[in-house]
């Protein structure tokens, strides 16, 4: 009763909700419905940090080559990811491919022991630009590859240059016919199980902006409803926090 009364007394634009990393789609849908129909607010966000994402096309945030497809890839490029720690099953498939086919694996930056050898190239935006402009040795390898697999990790999506890196690399793959109905070389490796479902339901700021996260940082909300969200990093002032969850407790202690 106290919670419902507090919500009723607060302006809708001063209420925000955040989806946690293990929230199922049914709960996400219910949360979205609750915010739209009851609270009359669009302040529902699934990201806890500023990640670039373009949800206009679903393939922009999927692992399009598929986990099984990794095994037939003839060139694997890792950009901003360590699959050994971020996706162990995926990493085992990459290792299986290497052991069977000696597939060439390239990583932008040294990410440590992945249990298979890989070539390390400079980890910066200039490298991406050189590849796109056909000025890097990797460019020709991508063109010659029949089933290339380019894997973007979340760390690269946090960069200020993320829009350029993602959109231009995607366009490069399209121009070179590496994105088609038969094979899609573009892959996003999401760390959280709820990410794809949240994007499918469009649970993020308008136009994929950082509006809600910016307002959170600036303490513009009076009520925060956390649906199992335990990863928010902000300096709490007078926000009234409602925590709904079972898998973690950090959010409950805010």
Task: Give, region by region, the residue ranges found by the protein language model.
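Catalytic alpha/large subunits of respiratory electron-transfer oxidoreductases
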Residues: 1-254
């Amino acid at each position: 009763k106290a919670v419902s009364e507090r919500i009723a007394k607060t302006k809708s634009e001063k209420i925000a909700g955040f989806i946690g990393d293990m929230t199922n789609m049914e709960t996400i849908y219910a949360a979205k419905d609750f915010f739209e129909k009851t609270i009359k607010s669009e302040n529902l966000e699934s990201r806890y940090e500023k990640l670039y994402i373009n949800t206009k096309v679903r393939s922009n945030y999927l692992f399009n080559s598929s986990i099984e497809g990794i095994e037939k890839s003839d060139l694997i490029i890792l950009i901003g990811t360590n699959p050994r720690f971020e996706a162990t099953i995926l990493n085992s498939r990459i290792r299986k491919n290497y052991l069977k086919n000696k597939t060439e694996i390239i990583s932008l930056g040294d990410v440590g022991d992945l249990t298979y050898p890989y070539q390390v190239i400079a980890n910066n935006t200039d490298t991406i630009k050189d590849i796109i402009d056909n000025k890097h040795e990797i460019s020709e390898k991508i063109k010659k590859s029949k089933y290339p697999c380019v894997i973007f990790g979340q760390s690269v999506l946090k960069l200020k240059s993320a829009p350029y890196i993602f959109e231009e690399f995607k366009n490069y793959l399209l121009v070179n016919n590496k994105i088609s109905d038969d094979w899609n070389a573009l892959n996003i490796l999401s760390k959280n199980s709820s990410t794809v479902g949240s994007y499918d339901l469009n649970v993020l700021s308008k136009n994929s902006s950082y509006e809600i996260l910016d307002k959170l940082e600036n303490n513009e909300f009076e009520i925060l409803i956390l649906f199992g969200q335990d990863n928010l990093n902000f300096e709490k002032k007078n926000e009234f926090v409602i925590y709904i969850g079972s898998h973690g407790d950090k959010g409950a202690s805010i």
